[in-house]
C-alpha cells in the first residue's frame, strides 16, 4: 500500500523547498597557465586560488598560443593538459583559452578573483586590471608572491633534468 500526502505550498513550512529562494552566490576564482609538466609551483598556485573561492576555474593556454609566446609547443597537447588539470583536487573546471583574445575566457567566466602565478608573464597585474576595466569588468586580482623553491620548481627544470639523464643514452624499455 502506498500513501501519498500532498501538502499545499506554504512559505512558512520549513519542510517545503522554496524555489524562489536563491542560494548565496558562489565565489569564483580563475587562474591561467600552460600547466605542461606539473610541478609543485602549479599546485601551490591552484591551492592558493582555491582558498580564496568556492569554485576554481583554470584557463589553459592553447598549444598555438604557447608556441607564439614561448617559441615552442607544450610537451603535452592541450586536450590532455585539460584532462589532467580537471582531475586535480582544487580544480572545479578547466577550459581552453581563446586563440584570439586572452580576456575572452575571463569575461565569459566572470570570476570574483583572478589569481596570477608568481612567474606569470602573459598577464601583468595592473595591465590586466586596466584592460578588464576598459571592457567594463572589475574584479579582484592577486599575484601569488610565494615561489615554491625545490629541485624541480618549473617545467623547464624538469625538461633539463630529463635531457641530462637521458640524452645520448640508449633508453631501455622494460
Curated annotation (Swiss-Prot):
**Keyword Nucleotide-binding: yes or no?**
yes
Q: Which Gene3D superfamilies match?
A: HUPs
GO BP terms, alphabetized: FAD biosynthetic process; FMN metabolic process
Instruction: Look up keyword Zinc and say if it applies.
Output: no
Cite a single GO MF annotation.
FMN adenylyltransferase activity
> What is the superkingdom listed in this entry's lineage?
Archaea
What sections of the sequence does the record tag as coiled-coil? none
Keyword annotations for this protein, in alphabetical order, are: ATP-binding, FAD, Flavoprotein, FMN, Nucleotide-binding, Nucleotidyltransferase, Transferase
EC numbers listed for it are 2.7.7.2
The cofactors named for this UniProt entry are: a divalent metal cation
Q: Which pathway is this protein engaged in?
A: Cofactor biosynthesis; FAD biosynthesis; FAD from FMN: step 1/1
InterPro entries xref list: Archaeal_FAD_synthase, Cyt_trans-like, FAD_synth_RibL, Rossmann-like_a/b/a_fold
Q: Which of this chain's residues are annotated to bind ATP?
A: 34-35, 39-42, 119, 147
Q: What family does the Swiss-Prot or TrEMBL record give for this protein? A: Belongs to the archaeal FAD synthase family.
Chain's role? Catalyzes the transfer of the AMP portion of ATP to flavin mononucleotide (FMN) to produce flavin adenine dinucleotide (FAD) coenzyme.
Oligomer and partners: Homodimer.
Q: In its UniProt entry, what is this protein called? A: FAD synthase
The record lists the organism as Methanococcus voltae (strain ATCC BAA-1334 / A3)
